[in-house]
């Protein structure tokens, strides 16, 4: 895992902007420092980000920006940021609610450390295996339907991700859920403690 930047090193104003957002309301997108995302996938990603009207932080290599649709950066200035690498700090921020990733090992560990669910788009090598583990073993995220970015595929993955979280929440607060068990355990401690 990459160590965080020292406090106050908010070079791009990213953390300051995240501080103004609601908890779990920001989409974070990053494909690592090595991967070159295909231009048509960057276009689809930009369309999803703009259409969603959700706040976002997109951490990409500078040469990737030229593939966004004309005017995208201008139209989304108040909605999001497209900046170089700041991943650890971003994933540790409570405003981040979903992370779209290339499924690199460090990225997954940082996502877990930040408690952020993921949408995986592996590109090659170990990323493919990591993506399968993310979805099928750890169950902390989903991979894109077709394995590449399409507007429909990303929107569908977001929908599945939120439905999966809804089901977990319903289960946890249901009659036999962990929330009820924890409340009963707390009540036992409170009412059975001698003062």
Residue ranges and their predicted role:
Residues 1-195:
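Catalytic core of nucleotide-sugar-dependent glycosyltransferases
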């Amino acid at each position: 895992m990459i160590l965080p930047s020292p406090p106050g090193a908010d070079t791009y104003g990213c953390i300051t902007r995240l501080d103004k957002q609601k908890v779990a309301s920001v989409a974070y997108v990053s494909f690592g420092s090595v991967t070159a995302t295909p231009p048509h996938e960057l276009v689809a990603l930009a369309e999803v980000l703009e259409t969603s009207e959700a706040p976002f932080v997109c951490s990409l290599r500078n040469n990737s920006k030229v593939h966004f649709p004309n005017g995208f950066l201008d139209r989304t200035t108040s909605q999001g940021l497209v900046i170089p690498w700041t991943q650890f700090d971003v994933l540790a921020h409570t405003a981040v609610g979903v992370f779209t990733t290339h499924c690199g090992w460090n990225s997954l560990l940082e996502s877990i450390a930040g408690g952020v669910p993921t949408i995986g788009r592996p590109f090659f090598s170990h990323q493919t295996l990591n993506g399968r583990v993310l979805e099928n073993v750890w169950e902390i995220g989903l991979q894109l339907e077709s394995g590449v970015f399409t507007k429909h595929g990303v929107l569908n993955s977001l929908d599945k991700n939120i439905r999966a979280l809804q089901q977990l929440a319903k289960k946890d607060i249901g009659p036999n859920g962990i929330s009820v068990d924890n409340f009963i355990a707390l009540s036992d401690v409170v009412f059975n403690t001698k003062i």
